[in-house]
């Protein structure tokens, strides 16, 4: 495989050489100036989502890349607009986040590791603010922060459970003021969310300045701008705000930018990357993390609400193994033919299709085909979709790249062409003027299928504090398990009759939403018993292998 020069990849989109800023040989940034050169041109936006996955994932990124490849084979100027991988999953459970097989982003190892340094810049900006916070505690100026009421948390782009709760400032008075602190993984940090949602440098600085870092001794809120942090943070992030340009395995363009997790953050690639794609491409293929209940709901209710973007339709990725998993098949047998488990799993798929319809969007079912899939079970799935007015496309992009993705590309083009006369208009699940409790209930009942929502006493206190800070009118970002529609990862299929319990609510004033935490969700993951890091090999020529599953 020979990778194309980045100026050639950019030229395919219509980007001029001066707007493609090389970051090494096969990575590049796209100048923000390029956005202003296309007037009001707008391509067609396609949202790729999925049903609730099995732990290894169902190949949503692979299918997004495959769709972009298939559209390119059909003569369309298509671009994938995807999230940057985090080192946490890369070395944790899932391995790399660049797709797989013949439908991958390249250079995969570079993208999965340091890429253009965006996540390091985000981590540095986050921890610069932490240093300024502790400096204010130490000196009592420029504002007298109460050491017992610091809200800002440190960040690291790694799964490390030992850093969830730490004590800092030990070693005597000259070394600091002892206090409890916490680390979040960078992909779950508010700085990551801010970068992903920012519309430019001025907006980035304003959002960073609004971040609430703690309270004074008399209970007044303190923001990042009160310790003069925002401009210095922007200085660290100014290059990270520019979208990254990479390429598919077949040489097509891909905009890979920002990487908030979808189970503990809002789960979407950057607004700037999406806008850049829409300005230059015919079709922009973007994904939202995990199932439709998480990333896609947040894409529509948070990212689109704030930016004014709206997709033309949804591609819902399914696998036969995941449907059987939700139909009760044991993990060891999901790859085997099992019509009964497959049909039972259709109830789970139907709930996701109902959620897509709740937003007023058309959908295409995309089956990520595995070698063991049988024709009879694929036909069973096609019949299920057809009975509900949804076309089903079987995609073999993993094995055959763009050639194996033409059926999917054709179905998506047919869906998009059908919306040209009357494009779908924004339809949100709730009005931001509703109470936080009503907003959470709207999501839980409509998308998760919950009967009721409960707030713990601690969560109710959090909401009272958020109201005092003026944040009650913000959208809600749900933090929930990705393995189930409910807040219990063991409840597979289509759970009914359950109550969603919110145990904590955090205000992300800079990002512009409140985070409602449910279940056992943690904002700093831990490594599994057998982390992916243990299978990585660096060869004598510098090649890195073992980052991807099955590699």
Swiss-Prot record:
EC id: 6.3.4.3
Superkingdom field: Bacteria
Enzyme class: ligase
GO MF annotations, alphabetized: ATP binding; formate-tetrahydrofolate ligase activity
Biological processes, Gene Ontology terms: tetrahydrofolate interconversion
Biological pathway: One-carbon metabolism; tetrahydrofolate interconversion
Sorted UniProt keywords: ATP-binding, Ligase, Nucleotide-binding, One-carbon metabolism
Binding residues annotated for ATP, in chain numbering: 54-61
UniProt keyword ATP-binding, yes or no: yes
CDD domains: FTHFS
UniProt catalytic activity: (6S)-5,6,7,8-tetrahydrofolate + formate + ATP = (6R)-10-formyltetrahydrofolate + ADP + phosphate
Protein family per UniProt: Belongs to the formate--tetrahydrofolate ligase family.
NCBIfam families: PRK13505.1
Descriptive protein name: Formate--tetrahydrofolate ligase
Organism of provenance: Myxococcus xanthus (strain DK1622)
